């Protein structure tokens, strides 16, 4: 039908515009956090773009349902304000046409949301953790921040490099405060150095024109050694991820895992897809605009219902993962309540319900 194609086209344009704006906002927020971590030396600077790209599926989990909800709300609200829907009703078209258009968009959005929460999201979460773990276990040159004192993760050493150029660096200061085994504390200063990457993942650090101070000043075995070249081999460390991290599990693994966190995550992912249809159905009657109130006030109830839904579901997921409640029971109770509310709102202005309401009104008057 031409009317349905028109409604779908107008809503899709609004949805894509809103999706782009929301992604841009969330993208900028994540960019600020990642850049802050890179400046502090927590992550290598060359991983900024990779981490940003891997964070898109996580952002899309909440943005996809919201983009459709706002797209329908704004498009239908505009059509009500411009009396286009009033003219459609005058021509004999019912609200079922609006519901059909909303459901068509909901199907396509739900497919994208399902692919995202079932495959793309877990894959990106797992790969993101792998990248961060690899960067921490085997930092290499990318993790060297020039002009800053950097402490090792275990606090055993402190490194300072004045300048870094590719695999070469100048003015090095390395203090091994708590060395392993029977080794004594030492301080190494060097004019320059470079890092070589081996095929097996190991790294060879070579320092040139420097001095090594070993021992403590209070002991007689304090040693000072000048050197032309000083080499150290840093072995490649294998990275192990947490196998119980539910964010990285696919749907089959979640289904077969009998833990509170797995059940909460499973119901949360299904809810994200179910929400697309439920909110699309609910937004049709909520988009009706009262000319005396204006579009902004007419949108408030819909926005409050949407916000309340996700606040409740987020709380249920968190408490369900901690074993404080049954996530399946409570999350789907909220889903069914909202679905029932959406059905009631769509049927509220139909002829059978009007007659039913009128009969109750007459009985109340008697």
From Swiss-Prot:
InterPro entries: LptF, LptG/LptF_permease. Residues 37-53, 122-269, 317-327 are periplasmic. Residues 1-15, 75-100, 291-295, 349-366 are cytoplasmic. Its main location: membrane. It comes from the Bacteria. Keywords: Cell inner membrane, Cell membrane, Membrane, Transmembrane, Transmembrane helix, Transport. GO terms for biological process: lipopolysaccharide transport; transmembrane transport. It is a multi-pass membrane protein. Belongs to the LptF/LptG family. This is Lipopolysaccharide export system permease protein LptF.
